[in-house]
């Protein structure tokens, strides 16, 4: 199986390493032709406005918009997957609030709840929050009552950075769904 990591900004190398640790072939995606033959695409965090511009300029916006490739999106990537006041892919049925947790200086780490009350150390960097989920969207991670991770079809959106944690549970869950 081969997946791609959108290599325009964000924690590209960390996501690559997570996939390699799971013995998954991984390639960097910088232009539309890089998506040929992929079973899935990881869309890392970064800054969502910049990411959107880079996607448009590279031709990847239209390619991803017209594709049904499963996507794992983190932080800014999650902003582009849901519904927002900004232009997004709207591939998942949830509303997201950009910079919900505040500015860069307000970034933090804390235990979040996943699945059957299992704990995961979430790393939130200028993080958004999923403020509502629609039909067909399943919440999979929570900060208190706030949804910070969800799935829909074969897509996964996380408002934190699982790639900065040694626990590969979210990468593993996504790969198992491909």
What is the predicted role of each segment?
Residues 25-27, 121, 138, 156:
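Conserved beta-strand segments of alpha/beta enzyme cores
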Residues 1-56, 63, 168-178:
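N-terminal beta1-alpha1 cap of cysteine-dependent amidohydrolase-like domains
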Residues 85-146:
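Pocket-forming structural segment of enzyme catalytic cores
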Residues 1-2, 117-120, 150-156:
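Beta-strand-turn-beta hairpins that frame and shape the catalytic cleft
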Residues 47-112:
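Cysteine-nucleophile active-site neighborhood
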Residues 10, 129-178:
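C-terminal and late-domain segments of enzyme folds
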Residues 42-43, 73, 158:
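Redox-cofactor binding/interface segments in oxidoreductases and associated redox assembly factors
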């Amino acid at each position: 199986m081969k997946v791609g990591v959108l290599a325009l900004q964000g924690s590209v190398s960390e996501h690559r390493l997570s996939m390699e640790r799971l013995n998954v072939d991984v390639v960097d995606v910088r232009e539309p032709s890089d998506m040929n033959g992929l079973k899935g695409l990881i869309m890392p965090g970064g800054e969502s406005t910049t990411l959107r511009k880079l996607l448009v300029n590279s031709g990847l916006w239209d390619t991803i918009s017209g594709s049904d490739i499963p996507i794992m999106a983190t932080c800014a990537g999650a902003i582009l997957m849901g519904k927002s006041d900004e232009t997004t892919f709207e591939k998942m049925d949830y509303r997201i609030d950009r910079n919900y947790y505040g500015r860069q200086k307000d970034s933090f780490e804390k235990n979040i709840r996943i699945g059957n009350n299992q704990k995961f150390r979430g790393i939130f960097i200028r993080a958004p929050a999923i403020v509502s989920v629609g039909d067909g969207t399943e919440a999979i991670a929570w900060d208190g009552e706030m949804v910070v991770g969800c799935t829909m079809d074969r897509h996964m959106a996380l408002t934190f950075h699982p790639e900065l944690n040694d626990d590969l549970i979210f990468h593993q869950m996504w790969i198992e769904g491909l």
